[in-house]
Amino acid sequence: MAQQSLAFEIGTEEIPAFDLSNAVKQLKTLAPKLLDDAAIPHGETQIYSSPRRLIVVVEDIPEATEEKNEVFKGPSAKIAFDDEGNPTKAAQGFARGKGIDPSELVVEDGYVYARTHTPSVKVATLLSSVLDGIVRGISWPKSQRWGAESEYFSRPIRWFVALFGSEVIPFTFAGLTADRFTRGHRFLAPGPFSVDNADELVEVVRNAYVVPSEAEREEVIRAGVAEVEAKTGFKAELPAKTLVEVVNLAEYPTVLVGTFDKEFLQVPEEIIVDAMLMHQRYFPLYDEAGKLTNRFIVVGNGDPACSDTIIDGNERVVRARLYDAKFFYDEDLKRPLESYVDQLAEVVFQEKLGTMLDKTNRIKGLAQHLVEDAGLSQTDSQDALRAAQLCKADLVTSAVIEFTSVQGVMGSYYASACGETDQVAQAIEQHYRPRFAGDEVPETAVGKVVALADKLDTICGLFSVGQGPSGSSDPFALRRSAIGIVAMLTCENPLTISLVSAIDASLALYAQEGIEFDHDAVRKEVIEFFITRTRVMLRDAGKGIDAIDAVLAVDVQEPVELIHRVEALEAARKHEPETFENLATAYARANNLREPKLGSDVDENLLSEVEHALSCAVVQAENRVALALDADNYAEALQELAALRGPIDLFFERVMIMDEDQALRENRLKLLNRFVGVFVHVADFSLLSK
C-alpha cells in the first residue's frame, strides 16, 4: 500500500522561548500517541520549531488502514447465558466491550466468542481529529484567546498548513482553515509560500529565512560565537538558560559583536553582566585573564546586510541600561550600608511573619546561637553577627531594586566601600548559597552561619504558619533550602552544630515575636522534613535503602548523624564484607531468640564461664560503642559490634539457652536482650540485607 508523509504547521505570533521549548518536548510524545490512538500506522515523527511556528512531520503513513477480522474469546457459555438462553450481564459487558450486539455472540466449545470486522478506512478522513488533538493537547503555562473565537493557545494562531502527501487535510480551529500556504521570516521573507507536498514543508520554510529547529539554531549561534572568540581572543559566557531563550527568540540568528564605553567597567562586574544577560539577552565577553571587557555578543534576527544598524541599536540599548546601573550604584554608595537596614521595615517578608527587618533581627538572633554552638572565635563571631545585621540591607538599594539577581553581591560591594571587614563583605555576598543542588557553599564559617540562619529562619517560619511543602508544591523552595543547609553541615569544612538545637532556637525567636503555633508539632514537622530530605539525598547518592531505614529505625534526628551512620554501614558492606557479615550474623542469632519483656537485668551468679565471657564482652562493647558514638566515630562503633561475633557464636555452641530450669533460661534470654541492646543504639540490623 502506498505511503505518504503528514506535515502539520501551526503558525503563530511569537511564542515565549521556554514555552516553545517545552511544547516541542510535548509534541514528541503527543503526536505519535494520537496517531496510535486512532489506529493509524506511522513511521518516525519529527518536530520542528521557530518562535512563530510548530511543525509536526510524520513519515510512512499508509493511505488507508488495514481491514481486520478478529475473534475474541469470552466467558463460558454457562456464565454468558441464563437457563432460558438470555444473555447475562457478563455476556452483555463482553459484547459491549467488543462493539457488537449480544445477539451476534457465537458459542463454540462451551465458550462465547465475538467476531469483529474493522473495514479499511482512508487515513485522510481520520487525520482531522488527530490534528485537533495536537492543537488542543499542548499544555501551556499561560494561554489566551484572540478575536471573537473561544479557543485557547499560547499566542494567537495566524495560519495552518496541513498536508497528507499533496492533499490538504480538512481542518479548522479558532476560525482558521488549514491550507498549503506557509510563511517565512517576518521581515526577510514574509510569504505566503505554497507547499506542494508534505515532504517539502520544512525545506520551503528553510528557504524562507527560517532555521526550523532549536538544535540547528543553537548550532548556528555556537558556531558564530566560536568565530568571534577566535577573532578577538576573548571568551563568551553562555549560560544555558539564556542560550535556550536566545535560541528561541530568533528565526534566522546572526551573531554580532557590540561595544560599550569603558567607563562603565567601573561599575561592579556582576551588575553589568546582569544588565546584559538577564535584561537584554546579550552574552558578555571576557579577556584571557577572565576580566570582563567592554564588548558583548548580540544575536540578531534581521537582515545580515543590516548588521551595522542592528549593532548600533543594541549598543544604544545597553548604553542606557549601563548608564542606569552606574547611576544607581553611585547613588547607593553615598550612604553607608547600615543606613538601609531600617528601610527593610517597608518590605514584607511573609504576610504572617512580618517584614524583612523582622527577619533580619531573627537571623541575627539565630546567628548568635549558631556561633556559640559552633564554638567560633570572638572575631568570627563578631563578623557573623555583623554580616547577619547587614545581609538583607541591599534589598532596598536602587541597584538591587532594578537588578534583582545581584542581591547579596551588591551588599558585599557596599559593605567593603564603607569599611566592613573582608569576611563580613564575603559573608553578605555568599549567604544566599547554595542556590541550587551542586552549587558551592559559603567559603567561611562566618558565611555558613549567616546562610544557615537565613534559610532555617525561612523554613521554621513557614512551617509555623502552615506553609510547608505539600506533594509537588513547594512555592518557597523550602526543599532546596533544606538541601543547602545539609550541604553546609556535611561539606569539606562543615559548620559543626546541632541542627535540632538550631531549630529550637529559631522557633523560640518566632514565639518571642508573638507568632502563635504549636511548638512541639511544628518542631516535629521541621525535623521530619529535614530527615526526609536527607533520606532522599542519600538515596539519590546511591546509598542502600535498607541501610538508610536501619539507621532511621533508631530515631536519628540529626541529618549529619544519619548520613555518617549510613556511610559507615555502606563502607563496611562494600570494603569490609567480613565485618558486615559478623555484624549481621551476630545480631540475627541473638535477635531471633531474645524476649524483650524479660528485660536485661542479668544475674551474674547464674552465669557459666562461657556466659560470663559473653557478658563481659557485652559490657565492654557497651562502653566502647557509647564512646565511639559520642565521638561520632560510627565506623569504630561497627567494629566493636562486629567483635561480638566470636563470643556470641561460642555462647550458642556451648550453652543450652532454653534450659528446663526457668531461672537459667530467663537469665540467658536477658543476656541476649542486653546483647541486642548494644546494637540498637547504632541501627536496626534486622532491616539490613546482605
Language-model segments: residues:
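Amphipathic alpha-helical "coupling" segments that flank catalytic cores
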Residues: 1-690
